């Protein structure tokens, strides 16, 4: 799994040996809080069937839901969690903001942010299922075109929009083939495509 910071932050997260100013994790969070007014959008991207929705669900369950004091807000946010399952079938069909209303998250030392995660379909992987129907690729409607377009094209377009238009932080979810029914090598082309899309924006990798 890799974390990428969009161009707004990249110049500040360069190590000294790269000619930049080193910042620890706390200072990064504090700086992002100040520059965004405390509202952070985490775009969870990568190939299909890597566990992006599962990551979002666990992130919400562990870090966000426990901090929601209003029981009704907590239940609404729980109802908005994405579905996840094992197997080859693609579960996510379009980009989705989770939760619908940004939730407060404390990062410690007085740093509080409002967080929304963005789920997306991801780039297609050989062997994945759910995009073919009657031996033809499914045609789907999107907010971006009046006519129907192929599922794969819609998935790529939505994923690129999450990367380029909506995310403060891009989080790439990868798979090593140790879970699920797809082999590691099936994921590699889609992983490379995801990282290349991020690098086009001039983002910096943060390990």
Feature roles, as predicted:
Residues 6, 36, 50, 54, ...:
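Residue-identity detector for threonine
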Residues 19-147:
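Conserved G1/Walker A P-loop phosphate-binding module
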